[in-house]
Amino acid sequence: MHVLSVSEINAQIKALLEATFLQVRVQGEVSNLTIHKVSGHAYFSLKDSQSVIRCVLFKGNANRLKFALKEGQEMVVFGGISVYAPRGDYQINCFEIEPKEIGSLTLALEQLKEKLRLKGYFDEANKLPKPNFPKRVAVITSQNSAAWADMKKIASKRWPMCELVCINTLMQGEGCVQSVVESIAYADSFYDTKNAFDAIVVARGGGSMEDLYSFNDEKIADALYLAKTFSMSAIGHESDFLLSDSVADLRASTPSNAMEILLPSSDEWLQRLDGFNVKLHRSFKTLLHQKKAHLEHLAASLKRLSFENKHHLNALKLEKLTIALDNKTLEFLRLKKTLLEKISTQLSTSPFLQTKTERLNRLENALKLAYANLKLPQFGALVSKNHQAIELEALKRGDKIELSNEKARASAEILSVDRV
């Protein structure tokens, strides 16, 4: 038997395995997943309850995956066995990877839904309210589509005062996602301007799931969620439910249904207005009768007022006026008294008045002296004290006095006073 070297046996194994297992499908659970940050290659193991095999997914194939590869996923990998002869290692070089029971697109969509759910894209609290009477609506659709024709027809019938503006958009195929995103951004750019739209409706008629799948794209979801203008998603038929339907503020089953939901019916509102008019007329008549009855009651009450009651009211008014007059009189007297006291105080402290008073006193004394002189007997004398005339009965012991007449003047001191 020929003896083989290690290199020879590994080379033969490599040739045999790679030729025999050129294309294989292997099912197992993903484990030990590592994604190289620089190269972008993914390295992992595929295992079942008894065995493990290593796998590699190179960057080019990894970029084509519709979903994120994660630990614990049950996958079916398609590829070929490759052997690294220097170490005798072998692995599966994966070309494609699919979930075991669901397609890769389905798994990718479920992962995207969970991502957006955590970001609040589906929360009712983040939804904008539907405008009650839209005046201007942007419709993102193909201007040559049957959907646009149906929407215009229904809008003109239901609410003709609303202006529908078609933003021509590619609604399927390559470039659809970018076209829809740009149209949403354009319509929303008018927000808070005089040409602002009250609503943005993304509309497309029915088709295959492949045709509609663009509306499951994350970029369209982002554009709808970030729009400041109220948005509606009306894609396909009733049975078609896409990611845009969940993210938009409101979903319509079809483009026509979007107009029926968004726009009020003018016929219904005319009927409502007629009903309001009837109710208003009835309410006015009822109120008029009530007010008339109330006025009649007041008139009867006024007639029942007697002359005595009127006289009593006048007496009360007179009493109030008398009290008020008395109060005003007392107040006037108090003010006058205060004013007089102030004037008296000012006069008593006036230097001019004091000078005049002193002069008047001197004149009075001189007058008394003159008068006394007139009454003097032939041998009598005028008695004065401190240059002021004084009567004898006013003197007391110790007083120093002056005696004077026309011929002489003398000083004396009172030794005693006898009362007669």
UniProtKB/Swiss-Prot annotation:
Keywords: Cytoplasm, Exonuclease, Hydrolase, Nuclease. GO terms for molecular function: exodeoxyribonuclease VII activity; nucleic acid binding. InterPro entries: Exonuc_VII_L (IPR003753), Exonuc_VII_lsu_C (IPR020579), OB-fold_nuc-bd_dom (IPR025824). Coiled coil: none annotated. It is found in: Cytoplasm. Pfam families: Exonuc_VII_L (PF02601), tRNA_anti_2 (PF13742). Its EC number is 3.1.11.6. Gene3D superfamilies: 2.40.50.1010. It is an enzyme of class 3 (hydrolase). Bidirectionally degrades single-stranded DNA into large acid-insoluble oligonucleotides, which are then degraded further into small acid-soluble oligonucleotides. Belongs to the XseA family. This is Exodeoxyribonuclease 7 large subunit. It comes from Helicobacter pylori (strain J99 / ATCC 700824) (Campylobacter pylori J99). The lineage of its organism: Bacteria, Pseudomonadati, Campylobacterota, Epsilonproteobacteria, Campylobacterales. The gene is xseA.
